Design a protein with these regions (language model features):
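Active-site neighborhoods and metal-handling regions in enzymes and metal-associated proteins
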Residues: 5-185
Length: 185
């Protein structure tokens, strides 16, 4: 089943890194289950052609971490899977580069939306002009969550990107996850 395929490796790596326990129960989703946000069943059989999504975290020194990654169970992407993976990887890289002290905390989100929208258009999933895709948020059919969240004493520290209609600026030592995704069932 999904959970047993990755959970023991996740726990092993957490302990090797100095953590004694997870910050939440890992999500391990194969195939179409990976398109369900916060999927909790974790009990389906994974097929050789499936992608597997692992969303896991651990606590270290009272701080909770979180990371999501997707990989082919066979070890090799199909051509279609690779094309989508590369768009998500580019969104990850560009969004990470957008985290600069003094810049808006909205920059990584906006960057991920732009990169993913262009990628979905290039791959033929969206046909509209890029400006329309972004303005109408048409990408939300495939990318329906935020780029990430703050890391802190809770898994999802309650820290918005804006305050009183003003965008919050990055400060030194602020930490957030960067977890873009494209979900195609």
């Amino acid at each position: 089943p999904e959970y047993s395929s990755a959970a023991s490796d996740v726990y092993k790596r957490q302990r090797e890194g100095g953590s004694n326990f997870p910050s939440y129960t890992p999500i391990v989703a194969g195939g179409s289950n990976a398109c369900i946000l916060h999927y909790i069943e974790n009990n389906k059989t994974i097929k050789e052609s499936d992608l597997v999504l692992v969303d896991a975290g651990c606590e270290y020194d009272y701080y909770a971490s979180d990371i999501t990654r997707t990989f082919p169970i066979s070890g090799k992407f199909s051509a279609e899977q690779k094309a989508i993976y590369e768009v998500v990887l580019e969104a990850h890289k560009k969004s990470t580069e957008a985290i600069i002290v003094g810049n808006s905390c909205m920059n990584p989100q906006k960057t991920s939306e732009e990169v993913i929208s262009q990628g979905l258009k290039d791959l033929g999933f969206l046909k509209e002009p890029l400006e329309e895709i972004l303005e109408k948020k048409l990408f939300r059919e495939f990318y329906y969550h935020k780029i990430g969240h703050w890391i802190g004493l809770d898994v999802h520290d309650d820290s918005p990107y804006t305050y009183k209609d003003e965008e919050i600026k990055f400060k030194e030592n602020m930490i957030m996850t960067i977890e873009p995704g494209i979900y195609i069932n």
